[in-house]
UniProtKB/Swiss-Prot annotation:
NCBIfam families: gcvP, PRK04366.1. It comes from Proteus mirabilis (strain HI4320). GO terms for biological process: glycine decarboxylation via glycine cleavage system. This is Glycine dehydrogenase (decarboxylating). Its cofactor is pyridoxal 5'-phosphate.
Length: 958
């Protein structure tokens, strides 16, 4: 035996599991690229002046079993008290059939945002269900497919109200004082950058004010009172003031829809529909509005359209509103939202149906009525006369009540002066109610629950008659057909089969980093130690979370070369916003609040200018040279021109053109010379980890897409996490929180509802870093770079590689130019993308950052076998284009312009110039394993001209 025990223990096993190719395959690819080793590859590609001598130290790797055991020990430090805190968060029950077949299913959680609708019909249908749930319960005309959280949705409502307001000189936004404090916090943060004045007061006080463009009301107040705002909203309409209403989705099952009372915008959280609290997230927010405001809505909207054969098909509608097209003029910077969580909420509604949901809501309300009656019998006073699930109980002995609750391992709401709050939920039982009566009142409960039940059932007025829902909801068959577990399981499986996710094939989307989301990384997100924690529980109960987040923050700080991390932002775009706010606040602290110019290269991702606009900055575009690099001369000229007002530059590294720009250090130096800060977008961090760091390069702040580089799955369009790393001078200016005190940052406004954003998915990134260790992380980056260069090398004779670095290499992604093919043969990047579906692949990123191109990012997780299959598909497509050029196939009837091809086409009359086999089995690989798209190419023009964003009749599904 020549192996040592250390070798046999194989602590770096996970590296081999995560990196797709074997050492032998890596060597073969290196040979094709003409390089002897991974280290030589990075030495040749990465500029010398930014290369690290050794990778950042995050420790050695660990096996899956070791990492899971270590994290489990940390998780057990969380104290699992029963939380009745409320404030927009409540325990819920995730039906096991949805847990197993959706949340834990890579066919659902590894998919990408459905930009390619032909391979996304399953989750698009589920998101349409989510929109239907939202439309029905809010009483509005149109709904989006989720936003990041309720507080963000409220801030978006304010921004939207200003966009659609006819009161152009009004700059005041009114918020009713019975709003969740975290919602108000995020609204104030957004208002500050827009220059809006936020006024908080009793709702009726708005009628005494001038210059108000919008109002935010909360139907069920944060302290529990149900508000009938119909008269107020009617009066506001006469004054042309836009009214937004924050609503509780579970309460809406019983309460009158705000839309029926005249609301213009309705928003809230769908967390109560089967999604765990998770210490604050991730949760899907819902957002709905009147039809007249549809063009001003933020976020993705799923619409019903048709495909090339005239059949019903779904797509993302009205994308011209969004940041990837409108940039700084976009309605919002929203990119990643909360699709996976929206799908869970939608399936929760599908599984329970309207009657099941009504039963749950009525049970919650009945138990709240019983609790109220029991407390009154025991001598307690309630602050309000109306409620759905939340009571505010007056007490002269608050300390005593809270001590009894603590002894019983119960959390009540503590921040109400002279009172405690208690919010019941789906998991509350009659036994829980008895305990609460005794704990809050300090007296034994001498009555009988059934007696109280009979009393309140016959006499309750806690929901006013005028506020009771009377209309039928969820009448579509989708909410009535799948109430048995068998039918539900099959429904989710049918939808899954329509989609292409990482469990089927590689997803080579440039700038998206669709890498492995390992099963071991995913396991902890369903542990009750993580899922059951309320975000506003006392800190001593969340020691496990705090330890895990602190360790992850320290690792990320080392990996990025920054001094501090802020883990609050819920997405990359929100991280951009938070980082730019830190820069803005830093300048203001130095008496330089006039610095508002943000320089952004023309190649930047659309979120950059959209985020800069949201942060109150003015975007000035910097040109790129013919090689795709930032034009240093143009940058310097504009930095000098705007030096008195220069706030920052936003750059991506490697660039969005897939190149390590040689002048990145010079870019940083120029900006600093003129008093600005450097924001380095972390979208391409997968080509930096272990090789260089943003801090070492010279930047001041970056966000990280944990759902790219650090293995949180994309979920079909969310969840994501976008924490920011900052240099020490910016650390005091990162987001704080109004509810939970955070070390060192208590004065700055929040950007997310919860202090750590979507905290319950952070264990995924913790597991990834812990298992890979320093060397594994560096190797992952190197192999990602190798894979991209291998693809470029093999394709270069058939496709033009648009950009490369000084040595002729690309970074972790490459761009192939389809424009010459379009000019010469009439075949577009769209045709190539759709034809790849017939070969079993999701298309690369289309027309970004350059129109008429495809950007390919293979990541380190794909094997050489899969990469070769993808390359062979592109080479075969190039040969098919030659067939068009040679006249074998007409330019208007060939397998590219007609792609993709569906199974149903095969049994129809075939009049094409090419065979059925050529259409659907274009390679040997497809004969062994075939993905069938559910629809043909979408008719985008029809979809936008005939906007329909709710469920169609069931006959259309069959």
């Amino acid at each position: 035996m020549t192996q040592t025990l250390t070798q046999l223990e194989y602590r770096d096993e996970f590296i081999r599991r995560h990196i797709g190719s074997s050492p032998e395959q890596i060597k073969e690819m290196l040979d094709v690229v003409g390089i002897s080793s991974l280290n030589e590859l990075t030495q040749k590609i990465v500029p010398d002046n930014i290369q690290l001598a050794t990778p950042p130290n995050v420790g050695g790797g660990a096996t899956e079993q070791e990492a899971l055991a270590e994290l489990k020990a940390i998780a057990r430090k969380n104290k699992r008290f029963t939380s009745y805190i409320g404030m927009g968060y409540a325990p819920s029950v995730l039906p096991p059939v949805i847990l197993r077949n959706l949340l834990e299913n890579p066919g659902w959680y590894t998919a990408y945002t459905p930009y390619q609708p032909e391979v996304s019909q399953g989750r698009l249908e589920s998101l349409l269900n989510f929109q239907q749930v939202t439309i029905d319960y809010t009483g509005m005309d149109l709904a989006s497919a989720s936003l990041l959280d309720e507080a963000t949705a409220a801030a978006e409502a304010m921004a939207m109200a200003k966009r659609v307001s006819k009161l152009k000189n009004a700059e005041r936004f009114f918020v009713a004082d019975d709003i969740h404090p975290q919602t108000l916090d995020v609204v104030k943060t957004r208002a500050n950058t827009f220059g809006f004045e936020v006024i908080v007061d009793k709702a009726e006080k708005v009628l005494e004010l001038e210059g108000v463009f919008g109002v935010l009301l909360q139907q069920v107040g944060t302290t529990g009172e149900i508000h009938d705002y119909s008269q107020l909203i009617s009066e506001l309409k006469t004054r042309k003031i836009i009214t937004s209403v924050a609503a509780d989705l579970m309460a809406l099952v019983l309460l009158t829809a705000p839309g029926q009372q005249g609301a213009d915008i309705v928003l809230g959280s769908a967390q109560r529909f089967g999604v765990p609290m998770g210490y604050g997230g991730p949760h899907a927010a819902f957002f709905a509005c009147r039809d007249e405001y549809k063009r001003a809505m933020p976020g993705r909207i799923i619409g019903v359209s048709r495909d090339a054969a005239g059949n019903r098909a779904l797509r993302m509608a009205m994308q011209t509103r969004e940041q990837h097209i409108r940039r700084e003029k976009a309605n919002s910077n929203i990119c990643t939202s909360q699709v996976l969580l929206a799908n869970i909420a939608a399936m929760y509604a599908v599984y329970h149906g309207p009657e099941g949901l009504k039963n749950i809501a009525q049970r919650i309300h009945r138990l709240t009525d019983i609790l109220a009656a029991g407390l009154i019998q025991n001598g307690m006073t309630l602050r309000h006369q109306t409620w759905f699930d939340t009571l505010t109980v007056e007490t002269a002995d608050k300390a005593g009540v809270l001590q009894r609750a603590k002894d019983a391992e119960i959390n009540l709401r503590t921040d109400i002066v002279g009172a405690v709050g208690v919010t019941l939920s789906e998991v509350t039982t009659r036994e829980d109610v008895v305990r609460l009566i005794e704990i809050i009142s300090g007296k034994a409960f001498s009555d009988d629950i059934d007696t109280l039940d009979a009393l309140v059932a016959s006499s309750s007025t806690s929901i006013p008659t005028a506020m009771l829902r009377k209309d039928a909801v969820l009448t579509h068959e989708n909410f009535h057909l799948y109430h048995s577990e068998t039918e539900m399981m099959r429904y989710m499986h049918r939808l899954e089969n329509k989609d292409l996710a990482l469990n089927q094939a590689m997803i080579p989307l440039g700038s998206c980093t669709m890498k492995l989301n390992a099963a071991a990384e995913m396991l902890p997100i369903t542990w009750p130690e993580f899922t059951e924690m309320h975000p506003f529980c006392p800190p001593y109960q969340a020691q496990g979370y705090q330890i895990m987040i602190e360790q992850l923050s320290n690792w990320l700080a080392a990996i990025t070369g920054y001094d501090a991390m802020c883990m609050q932002p819920n997405s990359g775009a929100q991280g951009e916003y938070a980082g730019l706010l830190a820069i803005r606040r830093y300048h203001q602290s130095r008496g330089e609040g006039n610095r508002h110019i943000c320089l952004i290269p023309s190649s930047a991702h659309g979120t950059n200018p959209a985020s800069a606009h949201m942060a109150g900055m003015t975007v000035v575009v910097v040109g790129c040279d013919e090689n795709g690099n930032i034009d240093i001369a143009d940058l310097k000229a504009k930095a000098e021109k705007h030096q008195a007002e220069l706030s920052c530059v936003m750059v991506t590294y490697p660039s969005t053109h897939g190149v390590y720009e040689e002048g990145i250090r010079e870019v940083c130096e120029i900006i600093h010379q003129y008093g600005g800060q450097v924001y380095l977008d972390g979208a391409n961090m997968n080509a930096q980890v272990g090789i260089t760091t943003p801090g070492f390069i010279g930047s001041d702040v970056s966000h990280l897409n944990l759902h790219k580089t650090f293995c949180i799955p994309h979920g079909g369009g969310g969840p994501g996490m976008g924490p920011i790393g900052v240099k020490a001078h910016l650390a005091p200016f990162v987001p704080g929180h109004s509810v939970v005190e955070m070390d060192g940052v208590t004065t700055q406004g929040a950007v997310s509802a919860a202090q750590f954003g979507s905290a319950s998915i952070l264990p995924i990134s913790w597991m990834y870093i812990r298992m890979m260790g320093s060397e594994g992380l560096k190797q992952a980056s190197q192999v990602a770079i190798l894979n991209a260069n291998y693809i470029a090398q093999r394709l270069k004779d058939d496709y033009d590689i648009l950009y490369s670095g000084a040595e002729g290499y690309v970074a972790h992604e490459c761009i192939i130019d389809i424009r010459p093919l379009k000019a010469n043969y009439g075949i577009s990047e769209m045709d190539v993308a759709k034809r790849l579906i017939d070969y079993g692949f999701h298309a690369p990123t289309m027309s970004f950052p350059v129109a008429g191109t495809l950007m390919i990012e293979p990541t380190e997780s794909e094997s050489k076998v899969e990469i070769d299959r993808f390359i062979d598909a592109l080479l075969s497509i190039r040969a098919e284009i030659a067939q068009v050029d040679d006249g074998v196939w007409p330019i208007d009837d060939n397998p590219l312009v007609n792609a993709p091809h569906t199974q149903y086409e095969l049994v129809q009359e075939w009049s094409h110039s090419y065979s059925r086999e050529c259409a659907v089995f274009p390679s040997e690989a497809t004969k062994r394993n075939k993905y069938w798209p559910a629809v043909k190419r979408l008719d985008d023009v029809y979809g936008d001209r005939h906007l329909h964003c709710s469920c169609a009749p069931i006959s259309d599904y069959e």
